[in-house]
């Protein structure tokens, strides 16, 4: 049975273009399989003998990068920036990251003032024992403030405790 179009055909070229599109769509759907994703949701996947790719775009997953030093990174699929690791800068090229050069300079912008301050900082401490802050004799501020937050009410707990005692006797008695 031949496919019929319920459109008013303006030109023969348009008619044949529509027929060609329908034939392509029918062949595409014949060679596809429906894969269940969850109840009520399906995705069309090409069968083994189909040369036509699915029109549904493939979901992109994060990129997993393994560096030469055997360190592993997971990078978002939309990230197109490079990164440096252990002195080597890795730039993105397509789906792979490749090491370009050794990083000898810092990635932080350094002014002469920053270099001077960094040179004056000593990283070695001659005293191996770390000094602790002196203890104060005054009461701590936390305990002083805890008393301010208390609700000052005169509550008579006697009826509550007597009722609790009676229920306990009834259960155990």
UniProtKB/Swiss-Prot annotation:
Membrane-spanning parts: none
Taxonomy, superkingdom: Viruses
Coiled-coil regions listed in the entry: none
Cellular compartments annotated: Host cytoplasm
Free-text comment about domains: The zinc finger is involved in PTGS suppression.
Family: Belongs to the geminiviridae transcriptional activator protein family.
Function per UniProt: Acts as a suppressor of RNA-mediated gene silencing, also known as post-transcriptional gene silencing (PTGS), a mechanism of plant viral defense that limits the accumulation of viral RNAs. Suppresses the host RNA silencing by inhibiting adenosine kinase 2 (ADK2), a kinase involved in a general methylation pathway. Also suppresses the host basal defense by interacting with and inhibiting SNF1 kinase, a key regulator of cell metabolism implicated in innate antiviral defense. Determines pathogenicity.
Known partners and oligomeric status: Monomer. Interacting with and inactivating host adenosine kinase 2 (ADK2) in the cytoplasm. Interacts with and inhibits host SNF1 kinase.
Protein name: Protein C2
Native organism: Beet curly top virus (strain California/Logan) (BCTV)
């Amino acid at each position: 049975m031949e496919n019929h179009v319920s459109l008013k055909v303006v030109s023969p070229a348009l008619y044949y273009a529509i027929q060609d599109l329908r034939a392509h769509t029918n062949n595409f759907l014949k060679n596809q399989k429906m894969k269940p994703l969850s109840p009520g949701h399906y995705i069309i996947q090409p069968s083994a003998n189909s040369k036509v790719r699915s029109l549904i775009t493939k979901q992109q997953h994060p990129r997993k990068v393994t560096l030469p030093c055997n360190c592993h990174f997971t990078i978002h699929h939309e990230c197109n920036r490079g990164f440096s690791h252990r002195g080597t800068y890795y730039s993105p090229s397509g789906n792979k990251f490749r090491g370009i050069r050794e990083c000898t300079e810092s990635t932080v912008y350094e002014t002469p003032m920053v270099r001077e301050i960094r040179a004056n900082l000593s990283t070695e401490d001659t005293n191996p024992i770390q000094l602790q802050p002196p203890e104060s004799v005054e009461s701590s501020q936390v305990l002083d403030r805890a008393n301010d937050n208390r609700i000052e009410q005169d509550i008579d707990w006697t009826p509550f405790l007597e009722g609790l005692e009676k229920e306990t006797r009834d259960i155990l008695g």
